[in-house]
């Protein structure tokens, strides 16, 4: 066991700082690593050499500011990560490496009445297929990220009440999936994970406050305040789908009337077009028809956009992201 404050523990901490900096940035020159981590150029050079020798990073020549430099990035062989996303009617699994490359992915429909155990069994099967198809070394799997459409208690990992996945409330999906796969699993609300992705690699890079809006079977927001995901004590922060737009509006699945979700979610808006476009109309077809100029679909999509805009405006006035 390493003694805190010892040379070996300090060295490991410096290794982790360098790997984290490169992982978040995608690639950095050694000078940029030194500035980002606060380590000396000599320390960075030694660590990069060590990481290169064990196959964790790759070093390639580049040109920075007109001078020759070496760009450091994580090796595709450094480790494997898996993403699992559960929705109201779908399961999606992606397998990738630490170099930000997606190696394989698969989506399949999911019965809305399926229990958590049934859904996780399906996820285990899909993960096994992707591992077999890609031939990756299971020993290199670093972990799994699991997204679910409901509030997660951070302390216990328990999924709160959710009508999007009604058979999942009260379960601990990360613990259960970890037991099936034998690797660490991190679980969070899907909108929170979307916000984190934008913060680290997307439109939110370089900002400290943002709101990520997800519209699917429900409507939710992932909130980042001062660079950190804000969940609230019960993990329900960002449930903008239940902002009241019309007290006399349609009854929502939450029991209230006129929630934003009742004017935007597919289960509520598609029936508006059933008489003119058939009961088998899908969300994808409605959007396609709207793009092609169909008057009814254009009207419904326009109304959805206006209602979402009202909800987002309220959120922006409150938080100023």
Model-derived features with residue positions:
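General beta-strand structural signal in soluble alpha/beta enzymes
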Residues: 59-60, 184-189, 223
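Short, acidic, Ser/Thr-enriched surface-loop or helix-capping motifs
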Residues: 97, 154, 224
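Short, intrinsically disordered, charge-biased short linear motifs at domain edges
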Residues: 236-245
């Amino acid at each position: 066991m390493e003694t805190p404050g010892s040379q070996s523990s300090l060295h490991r901490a410096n290794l982790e700082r360098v790997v984290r900096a490169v992982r978040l940035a995608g690639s950095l020159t050694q000078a940029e690593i030194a500035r980002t981590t606060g380590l000396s150029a000599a320390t960075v050079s030694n660590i990069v050499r060590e990481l290169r020798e064990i196959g964790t990073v790759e070093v390639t020549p580049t040109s920075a500011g007109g001078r020759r430099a070496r760009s450091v990035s994580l090796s595709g062989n450094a480790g494997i990560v898996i993403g699992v996303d559960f929705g109201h009617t779908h399961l999606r699994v992606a397998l990738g490496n630490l170099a930000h490359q997606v190696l394989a992915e698969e989506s399949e429909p999911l019965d809305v009445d399926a229990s958590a155990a049934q859904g996780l069994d399906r996820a285990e099967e899909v993960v096994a297929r992707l591992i077999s198809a890609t031939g990756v070394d299971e020993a290199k799997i670093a972990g799994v990220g699991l997204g679910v459409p409901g509030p997660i208690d951070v302390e216990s990992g328990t999924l709160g009440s959710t009508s999007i996945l009604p058979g999942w409330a009260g379960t601990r999906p990360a613990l259960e999936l970890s037991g099936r796969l034998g690797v660490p699993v991190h679980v969070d609300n899907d909108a929170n994970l979307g916000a984190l992705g934008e913060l680290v690699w997307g439109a939110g890079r370089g900002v400290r406050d943002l709101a990520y809006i997800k519209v699917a079977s429900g409507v939710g927001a992932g909130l980042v305040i001062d660079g950190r995901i804000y969940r609230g004590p019960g993990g329900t922060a960002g449930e903008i789908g239940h902002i009241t737009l019309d007290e006399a509006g349609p009854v929502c699945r939450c029991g209230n009337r006129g929630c934003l979700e009742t004017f935007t979610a597919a289960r509520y808006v598609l029936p508006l077009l059933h008489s003119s476009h058939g009961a088998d109309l899908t969300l994808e077809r409605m959007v396609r028809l709207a793009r092609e100029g169909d008057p009814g679909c254009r009207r419904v999509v326009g109304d959805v956009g206006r209602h979402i805009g009202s909800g987002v405006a309220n959120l922006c006035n409150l938080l100023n992201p």
